[in-house]
């Protein structure tokens, strides 16, 4: 039973580890790759069949990276010939595996850990680079024992345990905060404080990259809530400079790069990102879509299979930008309007309402000259 949401609160009454029932219809994930991957891990261990579907964008995203290890654990999962959703899952009695991830992905890691809760024996996941550890912190918060994890690249758990109900305080999302951090960083005279933001060290690559570019940024009131570090983030405008981004920071800022590309477009000099091929299989090909949009604004951009080079400029032009239904790209170009000499219109923005309800109102409150255009 789920009660709410009510004033930001949601109450969930659990049914225990063996209490889930077969869904009566396909489960629609909308545009959420995270939801699909996490539920795939959970459903792979259930004694029933289920089907996961999504919107047009999600249905074009490759899911082989979770299907392969889940199949090794014993699940049967069918997709399209292209390896994309819909995903038909026939649950099974799973066995734990040792899995070396070829690409750092918190979603793949989390999917396997959730499947491992029900598996016989130990499920061990090793990541090639440190990535987000929210799932590990959450499971520990629910009383489940894990070994390893951040700052080590290996984490494991033994199946068959139990989860204990707990209260969770969800901090403000740093991926959403990134748009406002960049907005302040590129707007002369801006001073901004964002309160109670999650600053999990596996997520703060955006802060480190902005610092290296010259942003005037500090943390206050640092504390830990529900196993997650939180803080108030202060940022003041300061001239930014182009940098070569350390590839080690890529998994720590993977969802923030659309906003960071806008910062790079407003910086003095050239910013180079490599080792970020993961950006090509997000809600859109974020390397190409961002490059196309920045070029429309007059920015010199070079793309690579695994990254991008952006030559900053003192001002941007105006244009009509196709976000390709990618919420983060839509919000990034909204922020770019702060340095544009004429109007920027962003198309296909409907998914912004899913990931960041109230973005337009909050952006207007922060000082952006922004309005929604009815279809």
Name what the model sees in each region.
Residues 1-375:
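Structural preference for solvent-exposed beta-strand-turn elements
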């Amino acid at each position: 039973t789920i009660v709410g949401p009510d004033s930001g609160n949601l109450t969930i009454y659990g049914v225990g580890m063996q209490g889930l029932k077969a869904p009566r219809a396909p489960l629609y994930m909308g545009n959420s790759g995270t939801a699909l991957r996490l539920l795939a891990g959970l459903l792979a261990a259930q004694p029933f069949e289920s089907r996961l579907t999504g919107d047009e964008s999600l249905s074009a995203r490759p899911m082989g990276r979770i299907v392969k290890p889940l199949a090794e654990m014993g699940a049967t999962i069918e997709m399209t010939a292209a390896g994309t959703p819909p995903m038909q899952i026939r649950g099974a009695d799973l066995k734990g595996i040792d899995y070396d991830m070829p690409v750092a992905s918190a979603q793949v890691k989390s999917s396997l850990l959730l499947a491992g809760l029900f598996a016989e024996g130990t499920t061990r996941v090793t990541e090639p680079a440190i990535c987000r550890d929210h799932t590990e912190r959450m499971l520990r918060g629910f009383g489940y024992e894990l070994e390893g994890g951040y700052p080590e690249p290996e984490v494991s758990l033994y199946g068959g345990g139990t989860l204990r109900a707990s209260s969770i305080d969800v901090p403000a999302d740093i991926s959403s905060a990134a748009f406002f951090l960049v907005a302040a960083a590129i707007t002369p005279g801006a001073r901004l404080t964002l309160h109670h933001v999650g600053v999990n060290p596996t997520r703060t690559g955006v802060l480190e990259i902005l610092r290296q570019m010259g942003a005037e940024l500090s943390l206050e009131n640092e504390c830990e809530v529900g196993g997650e570090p939180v803080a108030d983030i202060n940022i003041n405008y300061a001239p930014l400079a182009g940098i070569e981004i350390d590839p080690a920071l890529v998994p720590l800022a993977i969802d923030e790069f659309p906003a960071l590309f806008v910062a790079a477009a407003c910086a003095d000099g050239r910013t180079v990102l490599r080792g970020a091929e993961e950006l090509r299989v997000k809600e859109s090909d974020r390397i190409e879509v961002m490059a196309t949009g920045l070029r429309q604004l007059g920015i010199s951009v070079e793309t690579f299979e695994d990254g991008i080079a952006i030559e900053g400029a003192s001002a941007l032009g105006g244009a009509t930008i196709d976000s390709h239904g990618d919420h983060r790209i839509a919000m990034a170009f909204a922020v770019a309007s702060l340095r544009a000499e004429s109007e920027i219109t962003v198309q296909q923005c409907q998914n912004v309402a899913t990931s960041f309800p109230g973005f337009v109102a909050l952006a207007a409150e922060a000082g952006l000259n922004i309005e929604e255009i009815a279809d």
